[in-house]
Swiss-Prot record:
Tissues expressing this chain: Widely expressed. In scalp skin, it is present in the hair follicle, the epidermis, and the dermis.
One example of a Gene Ontology biological process annotation: spliceosomal snRNP assembly
Family note: Belongs to the snRNP Sm proteins family.
Organism from which the protein derives: Homo sapiens (Human)
Quaternary structure note: Core component of the spliceosomal U1, U2, U4 and U5 small nuclear ribonucleoproteins (snRNPs), the building blocks of the spliceosome. Most spliceosomal snRNPs contain a common set of Sm proteins, SNRPB, SNRPD1, SNRPD2, SNRPD3, SNRPE, SNRPF and SNRPG that assemble in a heptameric protein ring on the Sm site of the small nuclear RNA to form the core snRNP. Component of the U1 snRNP. The U1 snRNP is composed of the U1 snRNA and the 7 core Sm proteins SNRPB, SNRPD1, SNRPD2, SNRPD3, SNRPE, SNRPF and SNRPG, and at least three U1 snRNP-specific proteins SNRNP70/U1-70K, SNRPA/U1-A and SNRPC/U1-C.
UniProt-reported outcome of changing residue 45 to S: In HYPT11; does not affect subcellular localization
Stored SMART domains: Sm
PROSITE patterns the UniProt entry points to: SM
Protein name: Small nuclear ribonucleoprotein E
Sm domain span: 18-92
Length: 92
């Protein structure tokens, strides 16, 4: 355990991945998904549902090609968890 100054304890709390995804869902955060073995393409959208396999339902999804910076509107999609490498929140 880490300590700070006058004997005050600093407690580190582990965050479960499912809790982070749930927070993105609750806050209606726009997220960017990095895809497995698709380094030049990313998906952005708002999580409106997910399951224990990390399958995501995204609303207002866009396919983003990083080399050409082009965007393709996809609408509402279901993205299988097997395709997900990283999730990050993006500002609108």
């Amino acid at each position: 355990m880490a300590y700070r100054g006058q004997g005050q304890k600093v407690q580190k709390v582990m965050v479960q991945p499912i809790n982070l995804i749930f927070r993105y869902l609750q806050n209606r955060s726009r997220i960017q998904v990095w895809l497995y073995e698709q380094v030049n393409m990313r998906i952005e959208g708002c999580i409106i549902g997910f399951d224990e396999y990390m399958n995501l339902v995204l609303d207002d999804a866009e396919e983003i090609h990083s080399k050409t910076k082009s965007r393709k509107q996809l609408g509402r999609i279901m993205l299988k968890g097997d395709n997900i490498t990283l999730l990050q929140s993006v500002s609108n």
